[in-house]
Swiss-Prot record:
Gene: Srcin1
Lineage: Eukaryota, Metazoa, Chordata, Craniata, Vertebrata
Chain spans, region Disordered: 19-78, 352-448, 538-710, 924-982, 1016-1094, 1155-1250
Name listed for the protein in its UniProt record: SRC kinase signaling inhibitor 1
Bias (Pro residues) ranges: 552-563, 1069-1078
Family annotation (Pfam families): AIP3
Coiled-coil ranges from the UniProt annotation: 712-753, 793-813
Location(s) in or outside the cell: Cytoplasm; Cytoplasm, Cytoskeleton; Cell projection, Axon; Cell projection, Dendrite
Main location: cytoplasm
Organism field: Mus musculus (Mouse)
Amino acid sequence: MQPWQCLRRFALAWWERTAEGRARSPREEVGPRDPGGRGEPDPERSSPPMLSADDAEYPREYRTLGGGGGGGSGGRRFSNVGLVHTSERRHTVIAAQSLEALSGLQKADADRKRDAFMDHLKSKYPQHALALRGQQDRMREQVGGWTVDPVCLLSSLCSHLHGDSTPSGAGQPAQQPNYWSFKTRSSRHTQGAQPGLADQAAKLSYASAESLETMSEAELPLGFSRMNRFRQSLPLSRSASQTKLRSPGVLFLQFGEETRRVHITHEVSSLDTLHALIAHMFPQKLTMGMLKSPNTAILIKDEARNVFYELEDVRDIQDRSIIKIYRKEPLYAAFPGSHLTNGDLRREMVYASRESSPTRRLNNLSPASHLASSSPPPGLPSGLPSGLPSGSPSRSRLSYAGGRPPSYAGSPVHHAAERLGGAPTGQGVSPSPSAILERRDVKPDEDLAGKAGGMVLVKGEGLYADPYGLLHEGRLSLAAAAETHSHTRARAACTSGVPCALSAPTPLPRCSPTWRTRCTRRALAALYGDGYGFRLPPSSPQKLADVSAPSGGPPPPHSPYSGPPSRGSPVRQSFRKDSGSSSVFAESPGGKARSTGSASTAGAPPSELFPGPGERSLVGFGPPVPAKDTETRERMEAMEKQIASLTGLVQSALLRGSEPETPSEKVEGSNGAATPSAPVCGSGSKSSGATPVSGPPPPSASSTPAGQPTAVSRLQMQLHLRGLQNSASDLRGQLQQLRNVQLQNQESVRALLKPTEADVSMRVSEAARRQEDPLQRQRTLVEEERLRYLNDEELITQQLNDLEKSVEKIQRDVAHNHRLMPGPELEEKALVLKQLGETLTELKAHFPGLQSKMRVVLRVEVEAVKFLKEEPQRLDGLLKRCRGVTDTLAQIRRQVDEGMWPPPNNLLNQSPKKVAAETDFSKGLDFEIPPPSPPLNLHELSGPAEGTPLTPKSTNPTKCLDASSKRNTDKAVSVEAAERDWEEKRAALTQYSAKDINRLLEETQAELLKAIPDLDCASKTHPGPAPTPDHKPPKAPHGQKAAPRTEPSGRRGSDELTVPRYRTEKPSKSPPPPPPRRSFPSSHGLTTTRTGEVVVTSKKDSVFIKKAESEELEVQKPQVKLRRAVSEVVRPASTPPIMASAIKDEDDEERIIAELESGGSSVPPMKVVTPGASRLKAAQGPAGSPDKGKHGKQRTEYMRIQAQQQATKPSKEVSGPNETSSPGSEKPSGSRTSIPVLTSFGARNSSISF
């Protein structure tokens, strides 16, 4: 078409519109029109069966630009799909005057923009400068005072001109269908004579998109379907009195970053009026449906508080109010991939080439917008719908939905139509990025009817290569897939194709029945009866995936609805190659023979497949559900809202990250209802071009007839909903599994970390405790002080060395050279020497303090060393004592058996000798045995004999001897075995020296002599002797200070132990001894030590062993510190670890300091307790004191025993294994003889019971 033709049509169109009157409904649809039938009214323009109930009131006419040669197709009319709310229509009807006023206010600005734009076009297209200039003049004349948006108007012209400059093939631009997705309501009379508006509109988006790259988006209301965004009948007032000029004055409308100032001449009486005004002022961005959507909020500014709040009452709008429109952005707005415009293909199915920028995405709406609602003329083959239903009121969005790629800016579409025999070709639709940005989410607001047609982007770049293709990452509104049942049916009817390449345009492929059936099963086909006529639910990605592959034949090289691939794209080339491939399509609604025509046409379903009332062919979509079907409408609206979010989730889960190669297969697989992906037929809902464009299609499945449209749509809706529910439940299950796995991982990690954490915390706490431990801190401080001391000492030593060397040198010089040294030098040396002496003196004075501190710190180490050194000696001493006690007992038993008692003078003669020996022994033992903690209860252990201690007079010697002899025979064997064991264990121990023995004997003698004056008090029965000064330990022989003895002891009384009780008693804290055994009184020299060993001793050793036994008993009383005066030998610890009480006791510290200062160690006192004296009394309190009566009894018995021993010949050698110990030693005191033995400290009375 030549530029002048385009301009002429343009002018005629506007003239017609102006003449028709201002009150006309603003929703008139400028459908594709037949250039041949330009001025003829279309006989079928108002076919009642295709009108929704909503449209009956305002019939709408759609002119069709049928393909030039396609006989009968030229005059088709499409009834409005009903995409406009009734309220919106009412407002638009009564607001013509307001629109006039608005247009008048902006006329000057519009003229200026128009002139500037025409100049821009002339400079850019000099070859059309003449035509443009003439057209500019004619427009000024024709349009007159009516304000035309110059950008929209002239961009259409520019598009047309640019389209001519592209290879258009056969020069039939008139066949270019009008792809405006906005339905305009026609006046009640026909508009038959509108010249090629559709052609101009179709080209508008492409050419103007390229030519207007420099224009701002705000200034480009491009591609508005009615040529001018200023609606003649803009609804500004709802009230009957439109003459009332109670205007708010000026309003400021803000949307995004744009602000528009509006002069209002009429009162804004309702939200609908405000919506219409906003949609008018932001044509490319907002529509009535969007404004009424819950995703859009209209805010008004509170100047007092400087905040925006939601506008609920239009009466709040006053002069100079600021109204802000906030629209929630869709989740996928940030992704440039192919999305549905706002997720709804139905809304704007516009081509979006990958070269075209968002500002250039003009609304190249496909005829799809008319397919859904149009009822084709009876004579028109149903297989050739002249448009695709993409009918959506969102004109503004479509204007930005992007134009075709520059390569496709011409009118090549018509060639396909020509090939089809004049079938009008429908341009593919692709979502507009800007519109997508406006969507808050999959928006359930607008009709889906046209959507299905819009979804037909199949294999073109719109889907396959176009970044703004259909499915890709966008959230498809169910409507997009809603090319569902109606899509499937429409698919069958959709024959208008868009050639993919200019050189090889291919007609629109029709959908094979199989594809249709699949779509029917899967798509949400419910026709919405929502104030927009009927609408389809927004489709989900699954729907798109299904639509993506028709099963009827080879994949159409270029889906008629898909955006044409760019010139160089392989897709395009493959389309050219494959364009000849044939597919079957139905020629007529009656299901006439399907001509295997040009490649990309797939057969439309014969009308019998979707029989509609009145035999109407389901062009684009089946017969619409009447708007009054409120049940369907409400249900679908509710489901759309619920499913919209699920759709986005499912699609993002299935398609995110899967680029054009596999998304459709994935979606189909997830839906589970799709057959193997087959090339999409005319319905370009191929999701992101999943199937390769040139790939062979899968074999077509047999077509299955679909039921009635309504039933099919409901079935499809249920199936689709079920699929979505399954997908959602699967996703929930996977999410739950992921959560469980994550929880398990966390638990395992915790389990791994727990021991590590415990170990680390233990180490840290241990380190901190060590750091905070007073002993450790003290040790650290002492060590630092010692190092300082050593440094000072080293320095002094160095200085002294230097001084010595210098002095020696001087001395040598004087001796050899005989020269006199100068006095000052000598004085200097003397001064240095004096300083050194002073420093050394200070160092020496400092040493004692350091020494005492180090002693305290090193006490544990010192005692450990002592223990290691002295333990062998102690063991030897214990062994000797055991032997001595054994000898003594053997001698006593012999005396008892023979009835021979030594005279008292023998005992007295022997006692000094023994005492001396014992004293020497105790002096020689260089160890101390800290007693074990709990003092033993002596009364418990002593048994009934304690209460009535017997004196020698009360004992019947004969009875005692008889009982003893009987017991000895019973115990002989065990005693012999124990004796052998003891001998084996102690064989290696060395014997004490005579010096030690003598010292022990002397000490014992001294104690015995001190106790002799108490013999008179033998009648006292309960022993509770208190320590007296006589019993205090003597000072050490060397004169060192002895540690004071302050501890009261329960053992200070008589330490009698009955043999059986003593057998069961165990030392509480002494070094681990062998299991304790009893001392068996025997007349043959056998006895057992405190530690359980049986030894054979001679009479001479008895005193020493008594003392050792007494000491060993003391081991069990750690509270009682047995200290001797300091001696030269290092004192060992009684046990390798020092008792805490011993460490902390001040007396103990003083003793250790004294030991270290003297360089020796304390000689531990030796408490000699014979094994027989091991019987303890429970009644003896811890602080009990020895009883004088008990002392007297014990002394008497001791003197008597000494006399017996002197009478009998004592043998030092063990005679023992032949003799037996008396088993009856456990008998009451009547058969027992007690031998009192005083320890070296005299504070304890020990008795040997047998």
